[in-house]
Each structure stands twice: as structure tokens, then as C-alpha cells.
Regions:
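Active-site loops and adjacent core secondary-structure elements that bind or stabilize anionic groups
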Residues: 1
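Non-catalytic DNA-recognition/assembly elements of restriction-modification systems
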Residues: 4-34, 160, 164-168, 172, ...
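Low-complexity, Lys/Gly-biased intrinsically disordered segments
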Residues: 19-59, 73-77
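Specificity-determining recognition surfaces
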Residues: 40-42, 49, 134-163
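Glutamine-centric residue-chemistry signal
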Residues: 54, 113, 138, 150, ...
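Short, basic/aromatic beta-hairpin or loop at an interaction surface
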Residues: 55-68, 90
Length: 218
């Protein structure tokens, strides 16, 4: 394919027929949530899923320590109700920049002030997620943080992020390709983590057995 300069130094050359719009032009909503009145005191065991930055990872949502809010609070926070295909993007703290797509099957959900809802329009949600996870999205984030915005990413700054925009067909092809490849890599990583955990347990057991005399070394 014929490539031209993107006009953005750190992006470099891109296919000639791709566009580089600002994030604001391919989304219908960019905004973070808030903490309900009463903070953690209002969390309940069952109810509406309330997502925090520790639930948002690049490989998807992790709900092992998710908290819940009652439906009435969810209604009070209706402006930050999460919809299927929203991109959830961490905008503060050590996990800033992590993002994933909100998928079917979780049910009703809301977010706190550390998570930004990015609602795609005129762009494939999965492609946008990968774009934000890529060098393109993460470089812009680092540049903002270097510029003194160490506290986090503001909605206004986020709206001005550049994103890449191929044709809808190319977006789908790219998203499908990355879904397959990333899934395989994630599986390998998970397998290696289990092996590492087993070896660490083995090491700890060996040390314990030697220092307590259960294993003789002479």
C-alpha cells in the first residue's frame, strides 16, 4: 500500500487513505465517573457493578475484587452508566493508560472518577481500544504527563488525542487479527505465570525443608 507522512512526527508514515482525527471526532462521550456520597460505606455485596481502576486491564476487566452499588445510586449517577462497547480508560494513578472494552454479559455498571468512559461512534470499538493501547495512544499520554499533568489525564486533554482511522473493513481486519494474536500471547503469559508460581513454591519448600533439617545436606 502507498504510504504518506501522517504529519505527526512520532506517528510517522501511514497508508495514504487513512485519516488521523482527534478522539473527540470519533466518540459521542468522553467523561469519568465519581465516588458516590459516603464513599466505600455505600458499597454492597450485590447490586450494580461499580468499576474502579483496579478492575481495568488491557486484556479485559478483572472482577475478582469488584464492588457494587445499589440501583438507586446507579440512577443518581446515570450520566456515567456504562454501555456495551464503551472503552474504559484509566486516567489517574499507577495504572494510568490501561484500557479495555466493556463487553456483554456483565450487566449494569458504573464507574468512579479514576475511570473514563470513551463511547465510540464512526469507529470500531475494538479497533479504538487497540489504538489507545498502542504506541499512538500511550505516547500522547506520556507527553501530557511529562508536561506537568502528573495528577492524571483531564477530559479536555483526552479529547484532543490523535487516533488512526482506516476504512471500516480494515478496522475489522486489524481488530480480528489482534484479537487472535493477543489471545494466544495472553494464554502463553498465563501458563508461564503458573510455572513461575510453582517454581517459587518449590524454592520456598526447599529452603524450609533444608533449614528445618528435613533434608540433609551432608
Amino acid at each position: 500500500c502507498i504510504r504518506d507522512s501522517s504529519g505527526v512526527k512520532w506517528i510517522g508514515d501511514i497508508p495514504r487513505d487513512w485519516e488521523i482525527p482527534r478522539l473527540n471526532f470519533v466518540t459521542s462521550k468522553i467523561g469519568s465517573g465519581s465516588t458516590p456520597k459516603g464513599g466505600s460505606e455505600v458499597y454492597v455485596d450485590e447490586g450494580v457493578v461499580f468499576l474502579r481502576s483496579q478492575n481495568v486491564y488491557n486484556d479485559g476487566l478483572r472482577l475478582n475484587d469488584v464492588v457494587h452499588i445499589v440501583p438507586s445510586i446507579h440512577e443518581q449517577m446515570k450520566g456515567t452508566k456504562v454501555q456495551v462497547d464503551d472503552i474504559l480508560f484509566n486516567i489517574t494513578g499507577a495504572s494510568i493508560g490501561r484500557c479495555c472494552r466493556f463487553t456483554k454479559g456483565i450487566g449494569e455498571a458504573n464507574v468512579n472518577q479514576h475511570v473514563c468512559i470513551v463511547r465510540p461512534k464512526n469507529i470500531l470499538p475494538t479497533f479504538l481500544m487497540y489504538c489507545l493501547q498502542s504506541f499512538v495512544g500511550q505516547t500522547q499520554l506520556r507527553q501530557l504527563l511529562k508536561g506537568g499533568n502528573r495528577e492524571g489525564l483531564s477530559g479536555e486533554s483526552f479529547k484532543n488525542f490523535y487516533v488512526l482511522l482506516p476504512s471500516p473493513n480494515e478496522q475489522q481486519q486489524i481488530a480480528t487479527y489482534l484479537d487472535i494474536k493477543c489471545s494466544k500471547i495472553d494464554h502463553i503469559v498465563a501458563t508461564q505465570k503458573k510455572k513461575i508460581a510453582y517454581l517459587q513454591e518449590l524454592k520456598q519448600s526447599l529452603i524450609t525443608n533444608v533449614v528445618t533439617g528435613k533434608i540433609k545436606v551432608s
